[in-house]
Amino acid sequence: MSERAPLVIIGTGLAGYNLAREWRKLDGETPLLMITADDGRSYSKPMLSTGFSKNKDADGLAMAEPGAMAEQLNARILTHTRVTGIDPGHQRIWIGEEEVRYRDLVLAWGAEPIRVPVEGDAQDALYPINDLEDYARFRQAAAGKRRVLLLGAGLIGCEFANDLSSGGYQLDVVAPCEQVMPGLLHPAAAKAVQAGLEGLGVRFHLGPVLASLKKAGEGLEAHLSDGEVIPCDLVVSAVGLRPRTELAFAAGLAVNRGIVVDRSLRTSHANIYALGDCAEVDGLNLLYVMPLMACARALAQTLAGNPSQVAYGPMPVTVKTPACPLVVSPPPRGMDGQWLVEGSGTDLKVLCRDTAGRVIGYALTGAAVNEKLALNKELPGLMA
């Protein structure tokens, strides 16, 4: 009698491990194989942008070793292992020359940092921080240094600016935009967040891009496209993430911005699912924890034999910028409204109302974040 094919989950980040936990509550017997390109330690990715202010190294942010996770989940976990191919027609994957069969396959391999082309002889001093191993490398490089240039003024860029500044570093932020968190924040809220970070000593250079990075004595010189030269010791790249889709595309799965899945988290091929940062769920690619958790619960049910679809209710995002606390909930797609700004300084309530006067989105800064629970009750779901 042949051995049962396992559920295979590629990825051991928040998406992979949370799905495995939820599924094991429903099915304790079916074999489970998890495969990861990194070291397999369990950690919370959002905590990567809090490590310096809390003075935590990578080991301090890790919550469990892969061996402990394997025991907890009754799973086999392959670390530092790259899947090289997917064969949907025969329900198998390839790890080099090794064939691994699956009952169901879940792609939870996340997103990768967007790489920016930079001239100069110091490109090795440019660090993305997208996982625990990236964080460990950067923290080692940052030891004894003080001047950090940060590329990107989006959500993650602002969180790292707050964290590194609170951790004692001198921060310069460079981004080719007119405000922080463009596309996410109303300009008034963006101005409040920027003011809060400037209060920590963060310097913003909005508009230009980093043209070249050159070694200069014991440090570096960052040459911006507008001619400004900023002395620094190392550079953090936080210009954004791109869902990993290449392997899925090569296997014939439908991809768009992310791997295309329906509300059951099913891809265009039977028995293959995706969730987390790599997935585009019914047209939405949301790189946040709340949607991921909702998807993990729904997919666990489906994989346990109880077909389920995910629904997104209101999903406000709490941004970790203590210099100016921020909670934001953009209006759902297809909904338009008028923005109104109340408050002053860094304490703003910025509401978006539709033509009937209903609140469909908000940005709350400073003391106004205390109103989030009341406002959340008024919000429409992102994907009902």
From Swiss-Prot:
Cellular component aspect of the GO annotation: cytoplasm
Induction: Constitutively expressed.
A GO biological-process term: alkane catabolic process
Binding site for FAD: 12-15, 36-37, 45, 83, 159, 277, 289, 320
Enzyme Commission number(s) from the entry: 1.18.1.1
Cofactor(s) recorded in Swiss-Prot or TrEMBL: FAD
Molecular-function GO terms, alphabetical: flavin adenine dinucleotide binding; rubredoxin-NAD+ reductase activity; rubredoxin-NADP+ reductase activity
Keyword Phosphoprotein (UniProt): no
Cell compartment(s), UniProt: Cytoplasm
UniProt keywords, alphabetically: Cytoplasm, FAD, Flavoprotein, NAD, Oxidoreductase
Superkingdom as given in the UniProt entry: Bacteria
Keyword Cytoplasm part of the UniProt annotation: yes
Known catalytic reactions: 2 reduced [rubredoxin] + NAD(+) + H(+) = 2 oxidized [rubredoxin] + NADH
Pathway annotation from the record: Hydrocarbon metabolism; alkane degradation
Family statement drawn from the similarity comment of this UniProt entry: Belongs to the FAD-dependent oxidoreductase family.
Stated role: Involved in the hydrocarbon hydroxylating system, which transfers electrons from NADH to rubredoxin reductase and then through rubredoxin to alkane 1 monooxygenase.
Subunit structure: Homodimer.
Protein name as catalogued: Rubredoxin-NAD(+) reductase
Species, as recorded: Pseudomonas aeruginosa (strain ATCC 15692 / DSM 22644 / CIP 104116 / JCM 14847 / LMG 12228 / 1C / PRS 101 / PAO1)
